[in-house]
Design a protein with these regions (language model features):
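Intrinsically disordered, low-complexity terminal tails and inter-domain linkers enriched
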Residues: 5-20
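An alpha-helical support segment within catalytic cores of ATP-dependent transferases
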Residues: 19-38, 139-191, 196, 202-203, ...
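ATP-binding pocket architecture of kinase catalytic cores
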Residues: 44-145, 183
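Active-site acidic catalytic loop and adjacent metal/ATP-binding pocket
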Residues: 44-58, 64-65, 176-221
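Active-site Asp-x-Gly
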Residues: 75, 187-188, 201-252
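Helical subdomain adjoining the active site within ATP-dependent kinase catalytic cores
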Residues: 215, 246-248, 261-271
Length: 271
């Protein structure tokens, strides 16, 4: 959830390195990506905590290639992510994929120049992203998506840790005290809408990227995940744009987001 992923797709001189580490067998498939000639420039995009992202350039055409992390410990459902991504692309909320490998080892999409959500977003920015999240929550990409169980997800992450660790013991105790959010309100949620996963293009449109952790869940979790990443002086303003029917459960949602994030971090600090 919050801060678990960071895969910015805007490129500056400090965020790329000219490194060729994409496997040759993948680069050999460039014709499948709709290119007329093999790539002449490959730039590694820094920032991804889960996957590896590359800017591919061929005769002025810019693509983004993402090598997917296949570790099962991440709790990622790649086939679901693909279905959700394709649905969201049709809805105009995320960039369209040009190609994905049969094993979902990697996929390629158009590179969209832009910037991530600012560290101190404006009121208009905050209103715009809450509107996008509301659209996301109204989507139904497929009928058999898994449902996020916060307690189960936290327990799965902590099972990868030293069970005798004081931090793990304390966190397990906090998890047992969680109050579930109303199950009847569950809908499609992104579940990782932190600032780095928002891209504002040159026309001012916001795109929402990286749907790895998307699942059926309570919509307040999406708003909480983003809210916790905003400066404190922006959090109250952001909450004013959240649908009124969710505001009573926002404190609970923030607690759940924090616990899931801490569990994930403990697992990946020791795993």
């Amino acid at each position: 959830m919050a801060q678990r992923l960071s895969s910015p797709t805007s490129v500056s001189s400090t965020s790329v390195a000219s490194v060729r580490v994409i496997p040759e067998q993948i680069l050999a498939e460039w014709r499948k990506w709709g290119l007329s000639s093999q790539p002449d420039t490959i730039l590694s995009i820094k920032g991804g905590l889960t996957n590896q992202n590359y800017l591919i350039v061929s005769d002025g055409v810019e693509l983004l290639l993402r090598l997917n992390n296949t570790a099962t410990s991440l709790g990622i459902y790649r086939e679901e992510e693909l279905a959700i991504h394709q649905h969201m692309a049709k809805a105009g909320l995320t960039p369209t994929l040009r190609y994905y490998s049969p094993e979902l080892e990697y996929w390629v999409r158009d590179f969209i120049p832009g910037t991530t959500l600012a560290a101190a977003p404006s009121s208009d920015d905050l209103q715009a992203v809450t509107e996008v999240l509301s659209i996301v929550h109204a989507q139904s990409p497929r009928s058999n998506l898994h449902t996020l169980d916060i307690q189960a997800a936290c327990s799965q992450y902590l099972a990868q840790c030293d069970g005798h660790s004081e931090a793990v013991i304390k966190l397990k105790e906090e998890i047992t005290q969680l109050v579930p959010l109303p199950a009847e309100d569950a809908c499609l949620c992104h579940l990782d809408p932190l600032p780095a996963n928002w891209l504002r293009d040159s026309e001012g449109k916001f795109w929402l990227l990286d749907w790895e952790y998307a699942a059926l869940a309570h919509p307040a979790l999406d708003y909480a995940a983003l809210q916790l990443q905003l400066p404190e002086n922006k959090q109250a303003l952001f909450e004013s744009f959240i649908p009124e029917n969710l505001r009573d459960v926002m404190a609970n949602a923030r607690t759940q987001v924090r616990l899931l994030d801490r569990s994930w971090r403990l697992a990946h600090a020791t795993g």
